[in-house]
């Protein structure tokens, strides 16, 4: 399943190493010179990604196949923008605090765009830009954070295995079993394979 629905993925998902600037989090934060990384590097970190048809997601057979294969039984849609998200500034601040989850974080961008920041094996930040049509799965136990870009809008589908649980564990939470498993499978082994869903 990880190797399907890849055509044109680079048009909706892009990744690069971030600078250390404290400027507005919604800016791209490229290093100078820019250091783009291949999406295969994300796979090495356990991240799954696909390009799907966001204009017809209700009838998209590819989305259905992914959901069935990975057990994503629950779905909802959220708009993240100042006009539609209550307590917008506080929520965005929470999303941008570095954290992990004990389950996968699955997001499918239906409209707009945003940034998922993840850590590589050397604890360096990688910024993953996701646009309309991009679907990304961050493995359980991976430290990450999210922010909008300067357009200040994303409409995202959230997917879950079973009941929706979004519990962030802010760094450090290295003692959690999900983190230990992620470190063992990805970090200690040099990131050679995607983490399988439980």
Swiss-Prot record:
Main location: cytoplasm
One Pfam family hit: ARD
Reaction catalysed by this enzyme: 1,2-dihydroxy-5-(methylsulfanyl)pent-1-en-3-one + O2 = 4-methylsulfanyl-2-oxobutanoate + formate + 2 H(+); 1,2-dihydroxy-5-(methylsulfanyl)pent-1-en-3-one + O2 = 3-(methylsulfanyl)propanoate + CO + formate + 2 H(+)
One BP term from GO: methionine metabolic process
Enzyme class: oxidoreductase
Keyword Amino-acid biosynthesis among UniProt keywords: yes
Localization in the cell: Cytoplasm; Nucleus
Binding site for Ni(2+): 99, 101, 105, 144
Protein name: Acireductone dioxygenase 2
């Amino acid at each position: 399943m990880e190797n399907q629905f890849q055509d044109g993925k680079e048009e909706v998902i892009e990744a690069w190493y971030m600078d250390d600037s404290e400027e507005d989090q919604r800016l791209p934060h490229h290093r100078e010179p820019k250091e783009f990384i291949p999406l295969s590097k994300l796979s090495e970190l356990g991240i799954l990604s696909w390009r799907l048809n966001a204009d017809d997601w209700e009838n998209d057979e590819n989305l259905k196949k992914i959901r069935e294969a990975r057990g994503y039984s629950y779905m909802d849609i959220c708009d993240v923008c100042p006009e539609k998200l209550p307590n917008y500034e506080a929520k965005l601040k929470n999303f941008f605090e570095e954290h992990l989850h004990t389950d996968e974080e699955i997001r499918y961008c239906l409209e707009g765009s945003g940034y998922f920041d993840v850590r590589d094996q050397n604890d360096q930040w990688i910024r993953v830009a996701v646009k309309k049509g991009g679907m990304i799965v961050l493995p359980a136990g991976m430290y990450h954070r999210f922010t909008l870009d300067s357009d200040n809008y994303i409409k995202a589908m959230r997917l879950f295995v079973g009941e929706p649980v979004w519990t962030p564990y802010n760094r450090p939470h290295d003692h959690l079993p999900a983190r230990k498993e992620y470190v063992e499978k990805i970090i200690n082994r040099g990131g050679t394979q995607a983490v399988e869903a439980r």
